[in-house]
């Protein structure tokens, strides 16, 4: 599955997958106490009697738009969200994180806003920020870069291994684009097809943090998939069974981006299309899980799991897309 528009914007997803596969093979030679290695949402290692999950991630080129608009704080929240949302996808309760901020030049207000965002996100996720690193590297960085590394404690692993045909697929609404697809968005802005001034508030909305709702139903679900880079293809990490999804009408910002010049099919390969996290749950528990989650926002009954393989998506335009 090659995202051609994303590739033209400078992000070759196929190359990235090749890098991931190569790196995974090389680093596997270090595994001794590793329970889940590279390739899932988070790595898990056994330390004493504890299963510790660890994940590192950044916010990508959303930082460029943050700097252009001077709307900085949301990317601090994004950085927390991108990490803790991946930790919960292996069954972990996030507990702590450290941050890394790299600057092209000293930018006092930018650093303050980033840290304010990280702290706000950390409080929402109930994690402690226990340190970090700040660097000024004018020969390396353009603007600023931001990443976090988070750890969590796993009581019971959630890898998707228990998913079976007949299970339901639920989706929790996203707050917007979250932190993926921004190289493509920036390309549209640079080409004059999308107005940054008009849509800056939508484009800079922070990623929704799903820790509280997912922890509430963790013992009732079979798996969770954070919809980030690669969009719905990420569901293949959890199961090889066939997944059929009937996607809801997405928020207007996605339609605006599509109208600006992104192919309809491409939208579902790059963006979350209004769904931030996907859950797999048995038929017996589906209604109870859905009811518990409705206090945290809109919950969609997206589809089911079947015998077979691959992912079939019915888009909001009633077109059929196979991943």
UniProtKB/Swiss-Prot annotation:
Subcellular location as annotated: Cytoplasm
GO cellular component: cytosol
Primary enzyme class: ligase
Catalytic activity: 2-formamido-N(1)-(5-O-phospho-beta-D-ribosyl)acetamidine + ATP = 5-amino-1-(5-phospho-beta-D-ribosyl)imidazole + ADP + phosphate + H(+)
Entry annotated with the keyword Cytoplasm: yes
One biological process term in Gene Ontology: adenine biosynthetic process
Annotated protein name in UniProt: Phosphoribosylformylglycinamidine cyclo-ligase
EC number annotated for this UniProt entry: 6.3.3.1
Keywords: ATP-binding, Cytoplasm, Ligase, Nucleotide-binding, Purine biosynthesis
A Pfam family annotated for this UniProt entry: AIRS
């Amino acid at each position: 599955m090659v995202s051609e528009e994303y590739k033209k914007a400078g992000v070759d997803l196929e190359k990235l997958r090749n890098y991931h596969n190569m790196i995974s093979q090389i680093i596997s030679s270090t595994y001794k106490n590793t329970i889940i290695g590279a390739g899932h949402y988070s790595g898990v290692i056994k330390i004493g009697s504890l299963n510790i999950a660890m994940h590192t991630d950044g916010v990508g080129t959303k930082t460029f738009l943050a700097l252009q608009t001077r709307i900085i704080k949301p990317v601090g929240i994004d950085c927390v969200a991108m990490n803790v949302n991946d930790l919960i996808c292996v069954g972990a309760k996030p507990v702590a994180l450290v941050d890394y901020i790299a600057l092209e030049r000293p930018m006092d207000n930018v650093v303050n806003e980033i840290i304010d965002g990280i702290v706000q996100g950390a409080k929402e996720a109930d994690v402690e920020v226990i340190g970090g690193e700040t660097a000024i590297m004018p020969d390396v960085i353009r603007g600023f870069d931001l990443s976090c590394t988070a750890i969590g404690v796993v009581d019971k692993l959630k890898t998707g291994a228990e998913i079976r045909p007949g299970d339901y697929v639920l989706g929790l609404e996203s707050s917007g684009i979250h932190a993926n697809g921004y190289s493509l968005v920036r390309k549209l802005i640079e080409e004059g097809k999308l107005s940054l001034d008009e849509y800056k508030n939508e484009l800079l909305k922070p990623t929704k943090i799903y820790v509280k709702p997912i922890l509430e139903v963790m013992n009732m679900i079979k798996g969770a998939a954070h919809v980030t880079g690669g969009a719905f293809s990420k569901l293949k990490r959890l199961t090889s069974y066939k997944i059929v999804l009937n996607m809801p009408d997405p928020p207007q910002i996605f339609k605006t981006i599509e109208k600006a010049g992104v192919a309809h099919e491409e939208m579902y390969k790059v963006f979350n299309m209004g769904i931030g996290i996907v859950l797999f749950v048995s038929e017996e528990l589906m209604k109870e899980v859905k009811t518990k989650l409705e206090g945290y926002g809109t919950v969609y009954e997206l589809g089911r799991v079947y015998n077979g393989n691959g992912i079939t998506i019915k888009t909001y335009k009633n077109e059929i897309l196979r991943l």
